[in-house]
């Protein structure tokens, strides 16, 4: 494989010295960029964009042409795994993702296959290989998956949810069925991420978008336990380099200590967690990624710079910080504000690495 020209992101995740704090943005390939909208229109719909390796590569690279980002992230969706299990994923205008055959009971779980990542999910691996080739070693490529709990919420609810009553009903009334589903998902996700690593992903991230809706005890049993299983099953070295793993539970700031015990390399923080406090609690064990409020990108440039400076000062001197937003970038943010953000991170962080 090509020699990596900029390995800041990988080094920071392993808490090794860097010259400036690396930065990337969740959903950096997305609807805030006019060029993304043009490519998506060309693809026809969202899943057609994900399933076309050339177009998925194009949208992955678009933000890197605009901004000096320190990592690329595979353009895909967390729902590729349940889709490959045969649940019939489709997108409803204004409602987001839906499934034609939601999981309602243990019998439904028993029927679900564990998808072969090189077969049913082969289009994702093709995209990874294509992106790695086109990146030419400029920056590392991040692979990712949703967490078992987060994937299960969509599979049981039949789509997005605000109250999560359907899956919580299963959790409390039929926990055996939910554990069977989560176990199958943990196996599927570990295979899926390992296939991404073999195809060329140089780091991986597990997005637990909905872990924060659980009580502390339920989070341990129904979310963290299964992420821990995945981390235990991952390839941690490939192509002569360590492959760092980041866990991100949105709304999970109160559980950082437990998350840091999983053996992951880094934890993602949302904007509701104070980064100085997070570093005091777990900074001797894991790197931290985050954590500016994505809505700050609506602010004037001077205010964005001020917020970047505040978060950098909060983390302080030394290694182990990857700058990011606390969740995905909003689709109506001015692209030049994202540029202000990225440039400010590099310029203002230099003093913390001397």
UniProtKB/Swiss-Prot annotation:
Q: Which GO terms describe its biological process?
A: protoporphyrinogen IX biosynthetic process from glutamate
Where does this polypeptide localize?
A: Cytoplasm
Reactions it catalyzes: uroporphyrinogen III + 4 H(+) = coproporphyrinogen III + 4 CO2
Q: Pathway it belongs to? A: Porphyrin-containing compound metabolism; protoporphyrin-IX biosynthesis; coproporphyrinogen-III from 5-aminolevulinate: step 4/4
The alphabetized UniProt keywords are: Cytoplasm, Decarboxylase, Lyase, Porphyrin biosynthesis
Output the InterPro entries linked to this UniProt entry. UROD/MetE-like_sf (IPR038071), Uroporphyrinogen_deCO2ase_HemE (IPR006361), Uroporphyrinogen_deCOase (IPR000257)
Which positions in this protein are listed as binding substrate?
27-31, 46, 77, 154, 209, 327
Q: Which domain of life is it from?
A: Bacteria
Q: What class of enzyme is it?
A: lyase
Cellular compartments per GO CC: cytosol
Instruction: Give the PROSITE patterns listed for this entry.
Output: UROD_1 (PS00906), UROD_2 (PS00907)
**EC number(s) from the headed UniProt entry:** 4.1.1.37
This entry's Gene Ontology molecular function terms read: uroporphyrinogen decarboxylase activity
| SUPFAM superfamilies per the UniProt record, alphabetical | UROD/MetE-like (SSF51726)
Q: Where is this site: Transition state stabilizer?
A: 77
- State how it assembles: Homodimer.
What NCBIfam families does its record include? hemE
Q: Explain the purpose of this protein.
A: Catalyzes the decarboxylation of four acetate groups of uroporphyrinogen-III to yield coproporphyrinogen-III.
PANTHER family, per the entry? METHYLTETRAHYDROFOLATE:HOMOCYSTEINE METHYLTRANSFERASE RELATED, UROPORPHYRINOGEN DECARBOXYLASE
Similarity comment: Belongs to the uroporphyrinogen decarboxylase family.
Please give the name of this protein. Answer: Uroporphyrinogen decarboxylase
UniProt source species: Escherichia coli O157:H7
């Amino acid at each position: 494989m090509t020699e990596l020209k900029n390995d800041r992101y990988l080094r920071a995740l392993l808490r090794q010295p860097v010259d400036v704090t690396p930065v990337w943005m969740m959903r950096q390939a997305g609807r805030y960029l006019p060029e993304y909208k043009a490519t998506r229109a060309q693809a026809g719909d969202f899943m057609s964009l994900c399933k076309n390796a050339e177009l998925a590569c194009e949208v992955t690279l678009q933000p890197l042409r605009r901004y000096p980002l320190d990592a690329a992230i595979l353009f895909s969706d967390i729902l590729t795994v349940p889709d490959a299990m045969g649940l019939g994923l489709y997108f409803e205008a204004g409602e987001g993702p839906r499934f034609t055959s939601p999981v309602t009971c243990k019998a439904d779980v028993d029927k679900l296959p564990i998808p072969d990542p090189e077969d049913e999910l082969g289009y994702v691996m093709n995209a990874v290989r294509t992106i790695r080739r086109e990146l030419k070693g400029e920056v590392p490529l991040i692979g990712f998956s949703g967490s078992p709990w987060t994937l299960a919420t969509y599979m049981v609810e039949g789509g997005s949810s605000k109250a999560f009553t359907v899956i919580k009903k299963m959790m409390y009334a039929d926990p055996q069925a939910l554990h069977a589903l989560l176990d199958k998902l943990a196996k599927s996700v570990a295979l899926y991420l390992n296939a991404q690593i073999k195809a060329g992903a140089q780091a991986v991230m597990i997005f637990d978008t909905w872990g924060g809706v659980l009580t502390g005890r339920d989070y341990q049993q129904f979310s963290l336990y299964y992420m821990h299983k995945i981390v235990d099953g991952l390839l941690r070295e490939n192509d002569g380099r360590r492959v760092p793993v980041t866990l991100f539970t949105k709304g999970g700031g109160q559980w950082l200590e437990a998350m840091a015990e999983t053996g992951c390399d880094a934890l993602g923080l949302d904007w509701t967690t104070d980064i100085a406090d997070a570093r005091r609690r777990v900074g001797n064990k894991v790197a931290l990624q985050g954590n500016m409020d994505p809505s700050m990108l609506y602010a004037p440039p001077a205010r964005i710079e001020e917020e970047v400076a505040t978060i950098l000062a909060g983390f302080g001197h030394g290694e182990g910080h990857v700058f990011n937003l606390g969740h995905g970038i909003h689709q109506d943010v001015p692209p030049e504000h994202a540029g202000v953000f990225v440039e400010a991170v590099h310029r203002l962080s230099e003093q913390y690495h001397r």
